[in-house]
Design a protein with these regions (language model features):
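Short hydrophobic clusters on alpha-helical segments that form packing/core surfaces
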Residues: 230-234, 262, 266, 270, ...
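Flexible gly/pro-rich beta->alpha loop and the following alpha-helix that scaffold active-site loops
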Residues: 55-115
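Conserved anion/nucleotide-ligand pocket segment
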Residues: 157-201
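Short, Lys/Arg-enriched C-terminal cap helix and immediately downstream tail that follows
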Residues: 269-274, 292-294, 315-324
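DNA-binding recognition helix and immediately preceding turn/loop
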Residues: 208-272, 289-303
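N-terminal beta1-alpha1 cap of cysteine-dependent amidohydrolase-like domains
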Residues: 3-78
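…primarily DNA-binding HTH/wHTH and HhH modules…
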Residues: 288, 299, 304-332
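Catalytic nucleophile loop
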Residues: 104-141
C-alpha cells in the first residue's frame, strides 16, 4: 500500500477530514501559503463534506507575518504530530533558522505523514541532508545559490516538484498550485479537480516533471522559434556570454533579423536583453551568497566594470546592497 493509499484509507475509515499542518516562519512567502490553503479551501467548497482541515504552525507559535505585511496566528509545533500532510512554506530569508526542521520532518515522517517542502524549505533540507534527500528540486534561484556556495546539495533537477516517496520537494511560488491540484486529486474525482482548477482560472495542471522556466532551463516561449533559440543560448551562457555574432551564426539568421525580432517581440535589443539577464542573475547571487562582488561579476560574465553596470541598472551600488542585506535571503 502506498503512502497515498494509506492516507485515503485513514480518511475513509475515521470519517474525518484529512489533517494538514502548514508550518510558517516570520517572512514566509505569501503566494505559497495562499497557494496551499486556497486550493484546500476550494476543494472543500465543491465537495459535499469537507475533505481537509488545516492548522497553521510555527516553531514558537503566536502571530507570524510575511513581507507583504499580512500574517496569521499559529500554534506551536507538536512533538507528536497527528497530521496526514505537512507543508513547510518558503521564506524571504533563505537562511532563517526556523527553516532548519530536520527533527520535525522526521517526527512527521515517523507517523506516516506526507512531508512537502516548498522553495527555501526544500533547499534548506537539501543543504542539511544531502545524503538523505534523494532526488530533489527547489526554486531555480535557490539552486543557483546552493551551487555558487559549493553546497553538496547543489546538484538536482529543475523540475517543478519531485516526490521521493517520503518527502516532496517543490519549487514553490506559482508551482504551488500545480502541486496542490495534484495532491487533492488523490482524494477527489477528476471532474472535481478540474472544477477546482477552473474556479482558480488555472487552465493547465502542470506535471511534476515540467521544467521551471529560465533558471529551470525551459525556454521562454515568445512564439518565434529562432528568437527562443537565441534566448535559450543566452540563458545557458551567463558566465561566458556569447557574442551576438556567434548567436546569429548558430541560429542561422542575420544580426539585423535578430534585432528586429527582439524589438518586435520584447521591445529591446539583443545586447540589452542579454545584459539584463546577467545583471538579474548577479543580483540574485549578491543577495543570497557570500561571494565577493568581484566573484559575482566574474560568475555572470562581467570581467570588468560590474559595479558601475549594476549601479546604472539598479540605481545603487552592489556594495550598498550587500551592506543593507547583511546576509538576508531571497526577496519574495
Amino acid at each position: 500500500m502506498t503512502d497515498t493509499d494509506t492516507t485515503l484509507h485513514v480518511a475513509q475509515t475515521l470519517g474525518r477530514p484529512l489533517r494538514v499542518d502548514v508550518i510558517i516562519a516570520e517572512g514566509f512567502v505569501l503566494v505559497e501559503l495562499s497557494g496551499v490553503v486556497e486550493v484546500l479551501r476550494m476543494a472543500n467548497r465543491i465537495n459535499p463534506a469537507s475533505l481537509f482541515d488545516w492548522t497553521y504552525r510555527s516553531v514558537k507559535g503566536g502571530y507570524v507575518s510575511c513581507g507583504a505585511g499580512l500574517g496569521t496566528l499559529t500554534e506551536k509545533l507538536s512533538e507528536k504530530p497527528d497530521a496526514d500532510y505537512v507543508f513547510i512554506i518558503g521564506n524571504s530569508n533563505s537562511d532563517h533558522p526556523d527553516l532548519s526542521l530536520g527533527a520535525t520532518i522526521s517526527a512527521y515522517s515517523y507517523r506516516k505523514a506526507k512531508v512537502l517542502l516548498l522553495s527555501e524549505a526544500a533547499s534548506r533540507f537539501i543543504s542539511e541532508h544531502p545524503a538523505g534527500s534523494g532526488d530533489h528540486t527547489t526554486h531555480w534561484e535557490n539552486r543557483a545559490v546552493l551551487q555558487e556556495r559549493g553546497d553538496p546539495g547543489g546538484e538536482g533537477t529543475y523540475a517543478l516538484a519531485v516526490d521521493d516517496g517520503r518527502i516532496v520537494t517543490c519549487a514553490g511560488m506559482g508551482a504551488t498550485v500545480d502541486l496542490m491540484l495534484g495532491l487533492v486529486g488523490n482524494h477527489m474525482s477528476a471532474a472535481a479537480v478540474m472544477t477546482t482548477a477552473d474556479i482558480l482560472l488555472h487552465e493547465k495542471i502542470r506535471d511534476f516533471k515540467t521544467l521551471q522556466p529560465f533558471g529551470g532551463k525551459r525556454l521562454t516561449m515568445t512564439g518565434d522559434k529562432e528568437l527562443d533559440q537565441c534566448i535559450g543560448m543566452m540563458q545557458s551562457h551567463m558566465e561566458d556570454p556569447l557574442p551576438i555574432s556567434e548567436l546569429v551564426e548558430r541560429v542561422g539568421i542575420s544580426s539585423r533579423s535578430l534585432e528586429r525580432r527582439f524589438h518586435r517581440r520584447l521591445n529591446t535589443t539583443p545586447n540589452t536583453y542579454y545584459r539584463e539577464l546577467r545583471l538579474n542573475w548577479a543580483n540574485n547571487l549578491l543577495l543570497n551568497t557570500t561571494l565577493t562582488i568581484r566573484e559575482i561579476g566574474m560568475a555572470c560574465g562581467f570581467l570588468n566594470g560590474f559595479s558601475s553596470l549594476y549601479q546604472s541598472f539598479f540605481g545603487v551600488t552592489p556594495t550598498v546592497i550587500r551592506q543593507n542585506k547583511k546576509g538576508a535571503g531571497l526577496v519574495r
